[in-house]
Amino acid sequence: MERLWLLLRRLQGQGIQVIVGDIVLDRTAFDVPEHDAARFDGEPLRPYNAAPDALLMNYNAVAMTLVPDAAAGLARIQYDPPLAGVQRQATVPLATPGTACGDWRAALRAELSDPARVAFQGVYPASCGERVWAAAYPDAKSFAARAVEGMWRELGGKLTGSVRDGKVPAGLKPVFVATSPALAEVVRDVNKYSNNVMAQQLFLTLALRQNGAATFDGARAALRQWWQARLGDAEPPAPENGAGLSRDARISAQALARMLQLAWQSPVMPELVSSLPIAGVDGTLRRSQSRAGTAHLKTGSLRDVMAVAGYVHAASGRRYVLVAIVNHPQAGGARPVLDALVDWTARDQ
């Protein structure tokens, strides 16, 4: 949301304070099917279930910051971004003094399914201190419009019309252009924190650059073409949407290892390796029980899958490609085994 704020401030800095007419949001760069946020795991309000969108903002999520005020007996709630047309409860009562923090989200008894209203029926334990709760907005299609209008008005801007979706006419000269972060920065955010929707955005962009239209079919075709040109004899992956948040995506451990070997020889190898979580240090591996700093590995976990893949830095000075994929109803129990495998590989003497 910082980038949207800076963009609107930049617009106002050019002397534009009043927009007569509408703000038109053009999200036609991506052509993706309708998305059911509850389909994967029945948790539609979890930000990780957000759908890819050419104008995705803040993962279609609202960050609610709760700040307890013991003297007033309540917690104040700050909302980011401020969504236009949404009633937001400003405070919630504090729980009885001495109440343990515990499951504070459940204690709040939030009502988040109404696109026009955010409400809480419960209480907030002061012992929790300041906490942030990020929840997906229930009407993803209107999120960008509400966020743009809400932030524009919060910055003091005026709008005589509305914010709506549409296609910008060809040939218009941009007032200014905002540049995205470098690809290495995007990949780092995807890999360090297993950001599924960002992975899908990047996947679709493969098709956009190659075909001028971003579809999942086009992205899969672009990946197959790349794979065939470089790893033709290895079994190609079968991605569904470009992310690990899938029950249908497939890749063999051998094929993934071949790809990692190829990547090690690439000129952009340093950027790829630095994007991977470091065992016991950061990202999704910060709590790993493996010896800290011995490996750069991407993790993957679903209810019946546990996996790691990447590079292990051994005591001998050698570098090993490591791929381990566990498919089992109790796959979560394999985490200590995978940690032990990483340590065993690192102790190669």
Where do the protein language model's features map onto the residues?
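Small-residue-rich helix-loop
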Residues: 193, 203-349
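Conserved serine DD-peptidase/penicillin-binding transpeptidase domain
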Residues: 1-234, 340, 347-348
